[in-house]
Amino acid sequence: MKSVIYHALSQKEANDSDVQPSGAQRAEAFVRAFLKRSTPRMSPQAREDQLQRKAVVLEYFTRHKRKEKKKKAKGLSARQRRELRLFDIKPEQQRYSLFLPLHELWKQYIRDLCSGLKPDTQPQMIQAKLLKADLHGAIISVTKSKCPSYVGITGILLQETKHIFKIITKEDRLKVIPKLNCVFTVETDGFISYIYGSKFQLRSSERSAKKFKAKGTIDL
């Protein structure tokens, strides 16, 4: 062990390293001095014991990695979305035929939701499901309203907010119908359900978690 640590450089090794060759005693003295400076708190006996058994780690430290805080992407506010007109339907896209596939998807969605619409299916069950269902793609009609000009309007529901329905009619006209003071009908495979807009002033996401109470009569 000692001969390995204090091995003198050969002439070739000295030439390759561009250093002057030194004797074994000078090499030993250099190593001891270096170890003493590197391990000042270690006693000579402990240092000697370490040399006999294993290598001495002259310098060791761990680098603490800084935890980078993940920045959450900040979404646009409702006001910013309105200003950017993100939800506006472009005039060239306001075509009834363009949204017929959406209506077909909606009908299949309702069939799956109601476990198949059969002639003996209870209307109350369908009504309860529709109250919490996503209505985008449904064909809805205004049957009653305090504003006579709304009555009779029928189309595919494209957008729903807390207070309005936006529907596209067969005449390719986009209509904005307020929920307040209006009664709507939704037809699904022969089943007709009524929606009282005044009691339906919720966002679709909020409606799915709301418990609706059955009432005998509801005024506009």
Swiss-Prot record:
SUPFAM superfamilies for this protein: Rof/RNase P subunit-like
Disulfide bridges in this chain: none
Record SMART domains: POP4
GO molecular function: ribonuclease P activity; ribonuclease P RNA binding
Keyword Phosphoprotein: yes
Pfam families in UniProt: RNase_P-MRP_p29
A single cellular component GO annotation: nucleoplasm
Single Gene Ontology BP annotation: tRNA 5'-leader removal
UniProt modified residues of type Phosphoserine: S10
Keywords: Nucleus, Phosphoprotein, RNA-binding, tRNA processing
Localization per Swiss-Prot or TrEMBL: Nucleus, Nucleolus
Family: Belongs to the eukaryotic/archaeal RNase P protein component 1 family.
Subunit structure, interactors included: Component of nuclear RNase P and RNase MRP ribonucleoproteins. RNase P consists of a catalytic RNA moiety and 10 different protein chains; POP1, POP4, POP5, POP7, RPP14, RPP21, RPP25, RPP30, RPP38 and RPP40. Within the RNase P complex, POP1, POP7 and RPP25 form the 'finger' subcomplex, POP5, RPP14, RPP40 and homodimeric RPP30 form the 'palm' subcomplex, and RPP21, POP4 and RPP38 form the 'wrist' subcomplex. All subunits of the RNase P complex interact with the catalytic RNA. Several subunits of RNase P are also part of the RNase MRP complex.
Function: Component of ribonuclease P, a ribonucleoprotein complex that generates mature tRNA molecules by cleaving their 5'-ends.
Family matches, as PANTHER family: RIBONUCLEASE P PROTEIN SUBUNIT P29 (PTHR13348:SF0), RIBONUCLEASE P SUBUNIT P29 (PTHR13348)
Name recorded for this polypeptide: Ribonuclease P protein subunit p29
Source organism: Homo sapiens
